[in-house]
Amino acid sequence: MNRVVFFLVIFVLVAVPIHAETVVRGRVFDNKGKKTVEFANVGVYRPDSKLVGACASDGDGNFEIKVHKNGDYQITVSFLGCGSWVKKIHCAGGELDLGKIRLKEDNEELDAAGIFAKTLIKKESDRIVYDVSADPDAARMNMSAFMSKVPGLKMSVRNGDLEYGHIPLEKILIDDKENDMISKSRQYPMSFIKADYMSKIELILPNSPEYNNAAPMLVITLDKPLPFGAAAQLTGYSSSHNSHDFTPDAVVNTPLIGIGLRYSFNYEDKPSLTNEYSRTSYSADGSAPSSFEGNSTSDSDSKGQNLNMNLFRTFMKDKLRFNASIGTNRQDSHERLETESSIMRPGQNEETTVTASTKATTSPFRLNAGFRANYDWRRGCGVTVKYTMRNSESSSYENLFRESSGDPLYNHSANSDLQHNISANLKFRDKNRKWGAKIETGYMFRDYNDRTEYWSGSIGGMDYNQGVAYTDAMVLGNLFKRKMGFSIGVKTEYVDNKGVDLTSSKSLDYNEFNLVPMVGISWIFLKDYKLSSSYICRSKRPRQEQLNPYSDTSDPYNIKTGNPDLKGEVSHSVSCGLQRNFKVKWLNQLTVNASYDVTPNAIQRISTVNEDNVRTTSYANIGRHSSSSVSLAGKFRPTDKIDLNVQVSHRRSRYEIYGEKTNTFNSFSLSENASFDLGFAQVGQSLLMLPTGVTAQSKDLRVEPLMDLTVSKYWEKANFGGTIGIEDALHGRSYMKSTIFSSGFVQETWTRRRGRMIYISLYWRIGKFRQTERVTHSSYDLN
């Protein structure tokens, strides 16, 4: 307990900052003084009209600029379609609050002063664009800190990565391509590179017609090649559930070659879990021939290592890029299970069975590799060739102990997965970004081998390979001065599967052809409204663990197995969303979304019970699965220090199981997260209320709350940060109830929670780059 108190005290201590500059603040309103203005351009000028600081107002109309030298200045605030506001100020250190700023109805003040407002930021149909070249702060700030100039985009104190509206970025692209120095998983170099290496930042909002992204992503356009130098990050994690992780990552960029290295080690030995269940099986006439009660106690531990290295090099003034990567990993795990089962039949004595099992699995080091080459002849136009190879193997030894057998029973399983993927991508975009096209073609090959030698002497498994040839094509464009964006695409694929079931010698060969279309649109209208709509068709092939016919009999009354006869599924999704931005202080945004999904040949997990009340769980193409949902999301800001996001949703799901039985149910969910800026630290809180144990056979869904609490701190000068948190703060080691049913049985399961967990995560960044001075730009227009 004393250690916990010590860490908490050390964690929140912070030195009092010394203000060496003047912080100028204000809040921008329209000419009527009623509505706040987002994305207003704010500039601070010297008496000779030289720009010394710039920013854009956020969703509440607030802005903040740091002026580094004392003296007299002139501040201007402008916005497209409105007049401008001009005021002379004197900076002498500390803070200068300009209060409420009303934009004027004309630009006479700017013209008289000889100042021409520069467009820093604008909002398009699917993105927010910031012109870095027009901001003098780019020469003083690093890339990571500069990102906060885009309203809503900032570095998460919790882990040091960028997020938008408390949502982590899905992807980071440099010049619209994957980059080996800076990416979603390697963001720390931006803390040591000046922002003037960028010319433009594009924050791509979710559901972009061009990128089809589910979460926000970032596209950075460079003004010059990234500098030579090195950076590294160390991250560590430890929890009260005996789960630990340590990951060092480093990147070096030299004139000869660039090298990236990443190593990770993890260890986990979580508390054991005890689950209880009861099951009643019914005969065809509705009588109950048997009832079943049981419990199982499981425990496991695992440790793993992962090592990856990538090499990269550019040629022809950064137009030609090469990347090669190699990696390997190892995983060792041990599982222990004890079960006790009691079955009651009418007119017979109760039968009790006690079993135990241990299982040791080793996945040895195997080589993974990849290669990528890009050539661009101008921004938005280029070709990419890519190859990846993934290789993994595992070997498991299982000991089964049963009262009836006496001696232990032994099973041995060996599994391997080898994948090759080669593709070529061509994209084209006109200079004005009014239209473009993308086409990608490739071939994927997967080789699955699963073999099990059972204690009985029988052999099971499969020898299975799959080839997929595909071509994707997309046309995209924008209308109405980029207020509307659209995309139309189609994917064709031919799937050829060949294999044999080792148990029955049955052929697993089959092939199929899929035509997968896609349409997307995003439209901003009436300034504060955004309409987005899409139709997406997706193909999905079964995973190896779903296909593997290995029969897990460690619990003889609850058997688990795969299904090598599974076929792929094709799903259709239609969605529509309406977003409304508000100019009131406490409410930023409301969004309504509606969607409908249907999968004619859905892959689902299905349980059946035989006449001995033995349950077998496997995967099957059950038939049609459809769902419709509607959600309402809001972004609130009760005070300048508190951000609050809330989303409520309702979903209606319908499963048609083998064309014989239909299961329809409704579910509700709630997600909420809040952040509190205390100055010396940031407090986070999140709440999820979701139904548990949802399957095609679910019944009587129950909504369970899950709350997390965090306290985070980042020391900017030391480039050090971390978080102390509590997961599942509302629960101890209590139970969650779920129910599944079919025409032949009903089962109730009480699953024990692991309960609240305290954890600490830390990260430290170091780096040094040789950086050139910024070249002054004479044009500030956005392309």
Each language-model region and where it sits:
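Short, acidic, small-residue-rich periplasmic hinge/interaction motif at the N-terminus
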Residues: 41-43, 78-82, 96-136, 167-169
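Short, acidic Ser/Thr/Gly-rich low-complexity loop/linker segments typical of extracellular
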Residues: 48-62
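N-terminal periplasmic accessory domains that precede
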Residues: 95-102, 116, 143-146, 162, ...
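Extracytoplasmic beta-strand/coil segments of soluble accessory domains associated
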Residues: 144-178
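Short acidic/polar hinge/loop motifs at secondary-structure boundaries
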Residues: 177-206
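Face-selective signature of the C-terminal outer-membrane beta-barrel domain
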Residues: 304-333, 357-502, 524, 528, ...
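Surface-exposed extracellular loop regions of Gram-negative outer-membrane beta-barrel proteins
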Residues: 494-498, 527-573, 596-612, 729-743
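Outer-membrane beta-barrel signature, preferentially recognizing the C-terminal barrel domain
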Residues: 510, 539-591, 617-628, 637, ...
